[in-house]
Amino acid sequence: MQNKRESYTREDLLASSQGELFGPGYPQLPAPNMLMMDRVTKMSETEGDFGKGLILAELDIKPDLWFFDCHFPGDPVMPGCLGLDAMWQLVGFFLGWVGGKGKGRALGVGEVKFTGQILPTAKKVTYEIHMKRVVNRKLVMGLADGRVLVDGKEIYVAKDLKVGLFQDTSAF
C-alpha cells in the first residue's frame, strides 16, 4: 500500500475517490457530491476509545452545498443520512489505510441518535470514529462507534457502524 499517513487533504481524498491514493485494489471513497468530508485530520491504529483506531475528519459548511437547496426548500438542513454515510465512508477509508483490499460496502449500524442539525449557518462538521474491531480474513470488516459534531457540539451518535470490503460485489 502507498501513501499511509496520519492526515489527508481534500486533494488526497479526491485521489482516493479515483482509486489513486492507496493503489489498485484498495477501497475508494465516493466522489463529490457524495464525498462528505474535506480533510482527514488524524488517523491512528492505536488511539480511540477502544485503543483500536481513531479517525478525525472535517467538512466545511458553506450555504451553497448541494443538499441545502433540496432538503428542504425554505427550511434547509443537511440530511442526517449524509452524516451517517460519512461515518461509513471513514470506516471504509480506515480499512484501506490498514491494508485491507476490496470494494467498500456499508453493512449496517446498531443504533443512531440524532440530537441536533446541520444548518447552512454552521461553519464546520467534525466526524470522530472510534474503531472497535477490524477483521482481516477472507472478509475484511470494520466495526466502530462514531460521533458527528457541528461547531464543536455533538449532534449524532452511532454505535456499531459496520463496513465490509468485498472482492466481488455481484452477489451482494
Swiss-Prot record:
- Pfam families, alphabetized: FabA (PF07977)
Q: Pathway it acts in? A: Lipid metabolism; fatty acid biosynthesis
- Annotated signal peptide: none
Domain of life where this protein originates: Bacteria
- A cellular component annotation (GO) from this entry: cytoplasm
Q: Where's the active site on this chain?
A: 71
For the keyword Lipid biosynthesis, the answer is: yes
Per its record, the protein catalyses:
a (3R)-hydroxyacyl-[ACP] = a (2E)-enoyl-[ACP] + H2O; (3R)-hydroxydecanoyl-[ACP] = (2E)-decenoyl-[ACP] + H2O; (2E)-decenoyl-[ACP] = (3Z)-decenoyl-[ACP]
State its Enzyme Commission number(s): 4.2.1.59, 5.3.3.14
Q: Cite the GO molecular-function annotations of the record.
A: (3R)-hydroxyacyl-[acyl-carrier-protein] dehydratase activity; trans-2-decenoyl-acyl-carrier-protein isomerase activity
HAMAP family named in the record = FabA
Family stated for the protein in its record: Belongs to the thioester dehydratase family. FabA subfamily.
Quaternary context: Homodimer.
Q: Please state what the protein is called.
A: 3-hydroxydecanoyl-[acyl-carrier-protein] dehydratase
Q: Which organism is it from?
A: Vibrio vulnificus (strain YJ016)
Its organism's taxonomic lineage begins at: Bacteria, Pseudomonadati, Pseudomonadota, Gammaproteobacteria, Vibrionales
> What gene name is given for the protein in this entry?
fabA
